[in-house]
Amino acid sequence: MQRRLHIGGHEAKTGWEILDARPGPHVDHVGNALDLGRFEDGCFAEVYASHVLEHFDYADELPRALAEWHRVLAPGGVLRVSVPDLDILAHLLLQRHVFDVNQRFQLMRMIFGGHTHEHDHHRVGLNQDFMAAYLDRAGFTGLQRVTRHALFSDTSETVVAGTPISLNLNAYKPAMAAVRS
């Protein structure tokens, strides 16, 4: 059976190993998603992370995380990632005629994090253009936007006022390394 890694997961599911910064009964590996040194190169067929990347700083940590995730993916492996879509959240936040101040406050929390524990702070806002650039720099190809991943009951499927607020993407580690001339 091919190994699959769920980074930041909170729901146990057969066939998936969960890595999280905080221990719990569902967690297989406690650790930081920036350092997957416990795993060999190319050992996972899939890596899934929902609402994780926005917790890293955009200058150093986000590129390092994607490089690590790329490293542990097998050639031809898929990264399934979900982030709060800054474009959608910003648009909704500006709809003063639709949302009252309390509803807009909840939208603001989706942008900056809920601040419910030490890891619940968002350090970067992401949209499809930003994600495409980060994923390309990390060596991923074949970027696809998907409506939903339908793997876990998680924040990737959050809907506000009938609008999905997550940017759900699939990207692939090339099956063969590019030949440089």
Q: Which role does the model predict for each range below?
A:
Residues Q2-K13:
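Conserved class I S-adenosyl-L-methionine
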Residues I7, L19, V146:
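The conserved SAM/SAH-binding core of class I Rossmann-like methyltransferase domains
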Residues G15-D35:
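Active-site regions of enzymes building and remodeling cell-envelope glycoconjugates
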Residues E17, H29, Y48, L79-S82:
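Conserved Rossmann-like nucleotide-binding pocket used by diverse enzymes
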Residues G31-Y48:
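A short acidic, Gly/Pro-enriched loop at the edge of an enzyme's catalytic core
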Residues A45-D60:
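A short SAM/SAH-binding and catalytic strip from SAM-dependent methyltransferases
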Residues A59-E68, A74, V78-V179:
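S-adenosyl-L-methionine-dependent methyltransferase catalytic module, highlighting the catalytic core
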